[in-house]
Amino acid sequence: ELPDGEFPTVSYPNPEAAEAFELGLKLGKKVDADLILATDPDADRLGVYVKDAKTGEYHSLTGNMSGCLIGDYVISQRKEKEGLPKDGAFIKSIVSTNMADAIAKYYGIQLVEVLTGFKFIGQKILEFETKGNGTYLFGMEESYGCLTGTYARDKDAVVASMTLCEAAAYYKTKNMTLWYAMIAMYERYGYYKDDVQAITLKGIEGLEKIQKIMNTLRENTPSEIGGY
């Protein structure tokens, strides 16, 4: 059966939206799945629901949570199997969780912050390769995107899905679900709460309002926001 490019089962095929998981959750509960994955149409962002084995409930992971789960797993496995390079780097966007900082500190690698947009992570990878000033280990942004290798310069939900499934299998051998692996990370690195508020401005009026806001920011750029 060929996929339908119109995505008729959802009004908005976005892995950040709960409605995109309605059919997946229904099937997941039926077959008792450990995790449920969904990507966006171009397969660069990954949404995840994981099962709580004690309650049977499925919990949604934010992009920060899934990114940290994958990043911690990738880095820990590399450390165990071949050791970490002295100049190893974990790259994140400036709006991503500070748990990434704690993970980098725990493994003794550098934490590199870049501007919002995965292209800046890609640029940093290129800089590492050309200048020899770092070894890329993992990169993530809070908007459900990450990259586990240097084969690409953009986020990739296909390999992220594979890696998260591998992590789930690894933790299952230790009698842990991904949900409890996440809780274990909170206990090790500290508790971090994040929330994303999306504001949609529709139509021509919405576009005009957006342009007005952006023009105001460019012409009268604030020196601080919220006291920072």
What are these regions (language model features)?
Residues 8-13, 52, 126-130:
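Short low-complexity, flexible loop/linker segments enriched in glycine and/or proline
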